[in-house]
């Protein structure tokens, strides 16, 4: 037996969940990985802590092993070994999941750490090949430097493009350019049996539909093909500190919502709420003069002082980088770690009464928790939003008809114990926002998952009307549910007819 195989066995020996009559031995799994020359980290190896410390330290899970491929053949080999040994598989790109789903969301997964696969290559026709381990900041820098091109994506430069694009990809130019997944033209995917397939609108089109909104449930996306657009010459970022109190905030929020219904597509913005008060900030694709003109109908109604920062595309990306001096993030790279809880909602427009309840919650409940929480209310839709253009069924992303995105985050530093009341505080906020809507009127963004949802609740809220089709595609491409987490898409039941059964009945198998 090779030295690598012996090291793997030693690392796997402490994984008690493997020791049962239904699971092959540690030795079989270790030997398979060793024979395939898959780079692996196991418990006790120097890289283990870096690979397995989650962004959210409140939710810590222990993988059985972490594969660290540098090429797609190694991904396929690792998946094949896991399949043979009945071990669930999870992809981890940037590792920023709020619920540690990149580690499986539970113990015992083989994690495919993709961050060593981060190549970005721009073709002369403006299309780009981007490996799933690339961080958003690196993607932005490479596309700009290679050809002054850009891709619509979120604003945290350390987030990996793999999961970001697989479930949406909202950012501060999304109303102008749509979600990241809207620019996807193809993908290279490793399936449950180790097969490598190419999918697009014309090849494996059902799989291509599914990975644009629910990608992590269907395979390991090793590489994306994206269309890109010319990087805007000017993007103007802005902020307005709002002098609102509990009495004036509801009217201000309603005025902002009314303005957003018809605001130009070049404008993307959010209301940010913390213990220090309300702030409106965002970005405008264009120069400062055009931004000021666009905001004229709003400023007289909400008050506050406007501050602006005009720059080029990369300056826009740096502006939203939370003070990080380097946005061109490549491995080895570590993440900030927090102990946190997130929840949220995608909703239609809110009523005046709902905004009153929102403001009362801030003033009477959230403010008591000090300064560790934040709430963002993003404008998702509106008459001029590119996000709203496609139909709900055009991709697996099911929220094209929603107007607002809410995100609640409550955190402490990893050295502190997460407070018992934090979970309840977040759920109360979500209930205030959603309790006036029927279940089919609101949903949740899969890139802002809620750890407190059951599997059934999560699937319905993340994928809504598209869930049934996703379940059917799951049964076709991952019938054994190898790619899973506690909130992933589950395969539709397969059945076979039998002559003794009544019409419409079936035998499950």
Curated annotation (Swiss-Prot):
One of the record's GO molecular function terms: oxidoreductase activity
GO biological process, one term: terpenoid biosynthetic process
Domain FAD-binding PCMH-type: 59-231
Gene3D superfamilies: 3.30.465.10, 3.40.462.20
This protein's pathway: Secondary metabolite biosynthesis; terpenoid biosynthesis
Keyword hit for Flavoprotein: yes
Any Pfam family the entry gives: FAD_binding_4
Keyword Oxidoreductase part of the UniProt annotation: yes
Glycosylated sites: 125, 193, 281
Keywords assigned: FAD, Flavoprotein, Glycoprotein, Oxidoreductase, Signal
Industrial or biotech use: Diterpenoid pyrones display various biological activities and subglutinol A shows insecticidal and anti-HIV activities.
Organism domain of life: Eukaryota
The enzyme's E.C. designation: 1.1.1.-
Cofactor annotation: FAD
PROSITE patterns assigned to the protein according to its UniProt record, in alphabetical order: FAD_PCMH
Signal peptide feature range: 1-21
Similarity remark: Belongs to the oxygen-dependent FAD-linked oxidoreductase family.
Role description: FAD-linked oxidoreductase; part of the gene cluster that mediates the biosynthesis of the diterpenoid pyrones subglutinols A and B. The first step of the pathway is the synthesis of the alpha-pyrone moiety by the polyketide synthase dpmaA via condensation of one acetyl-CoA starter unit with 3 malonyl-CoA units and 2 methylations. The alpha-pyrone is then combined with geranylgeranyl pyrophosphate (GGPP) formed by the GGPP synthase dpmaD through the action of the prenyltransferase dpmaC to yield a linear alpha-pyrone diterpenoid.
Protein name, UniProt field: FAD-linked oxidoreductase dpmaF
Species: Metarhizium anisopliae
């Amino acid at each position: 037996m090779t030295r690598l195989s012996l090291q793997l066995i030693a690392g796997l020996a402490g994984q008690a969940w493997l020791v049962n009559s239904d699971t092959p031995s540690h030795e079989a799994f270790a030997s398979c990985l060793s024979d395939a020359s898959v780079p692996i980290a196991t418990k006790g190896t120097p890289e283990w802590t870096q690979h397995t410390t989650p962004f959210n330290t409140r939710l810590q899970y222990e993988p059985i092993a972490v594969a660290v491929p540098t090429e797609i053949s190694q991904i396929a080999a690792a998946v094949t070994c896991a399949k043979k040994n009945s071990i669930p598989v999870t992809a981890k790109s940037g590792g920023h999941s709020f619920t540690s789903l990149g580690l499986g969301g539970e113990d015992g997964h083989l994690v495919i750490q993709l961050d060593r696969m981060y190549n970005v290559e721009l073709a002369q026709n403006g299309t780009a090949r981007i490996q799933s381990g690339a961080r958003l900041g690196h993607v932005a820098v490479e596309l700009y430097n290679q050809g002054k091109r850009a891709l619509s994506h979120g604003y945290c430069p350390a987030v990996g493009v793999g999961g970001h694009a697989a479930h949406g990809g909202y950012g501060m130019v999304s109303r102008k350019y749509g979600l990241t997944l809207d620019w996807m033209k193809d993908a290279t995917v490793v399936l449950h049996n180790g097969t490598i397939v190419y999918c697009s609108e014309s090849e494996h089109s059902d799989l291509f539909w599914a990975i644009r909104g629910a990608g992590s449930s269907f395979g390991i996306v090793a590489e994306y093909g994206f269309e890109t657009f010319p990087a805007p010459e000017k993007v103007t970022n802005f902020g307005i500190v709002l002098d609102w109190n509990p009495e004036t905030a509801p009217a201000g929020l309603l005025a902002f919502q009314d303005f957003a219904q018809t605001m130009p597509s070049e404008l993307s913005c959010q209301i940010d709420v913390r213990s220090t008060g309300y702030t409106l900030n965002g970005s405008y694709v264009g120069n400062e003069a055009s931004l000021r003109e666009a905001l004229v109908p709003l400023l007289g109604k909400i008050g506050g002082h406007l501050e602006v920062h005009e720059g080029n595309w990369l300056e826009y990306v740096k502006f939203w980088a939370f003070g990080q001096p380097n946005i061109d993030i490549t491995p080895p790279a570590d993440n900030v770690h927090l102990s946190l809880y997130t929840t949220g909602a995608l909703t239609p427009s809110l009523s005046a009464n709902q905004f009153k309840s929102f403001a009362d919650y801030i003033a009477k409940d959230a403010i008591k928790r000090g300064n560790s929480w934040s709430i963002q209310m993003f404008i998702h839709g509106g008459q001029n939003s590119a996000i709203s253009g496609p139909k709900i069924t055009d991709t697996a992303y099911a929220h094209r008809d929603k107007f607002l995105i809410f995100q609640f985050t409550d955190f402490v530093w990893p050295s502190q114990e997460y407070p018992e009341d934090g979970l309840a505080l977040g759920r109360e906020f979500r209930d205030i926002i959603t309790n006036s809507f029927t279940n089919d009127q609101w949903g949740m963004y899969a890139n802002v998952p809620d750890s407190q949802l059951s599997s059934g609740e999560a699937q319905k809220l993340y994928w809504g009307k598209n869930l049934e089709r996703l379940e059917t595609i799951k049964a076709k491409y991952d019938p054994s549910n190898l790619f899973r987490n506690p909130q992933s898409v589950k395969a539709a039941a397969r059945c076979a007819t039998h002559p003794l059964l009544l019409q419409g009945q079936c035998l499950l198998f």
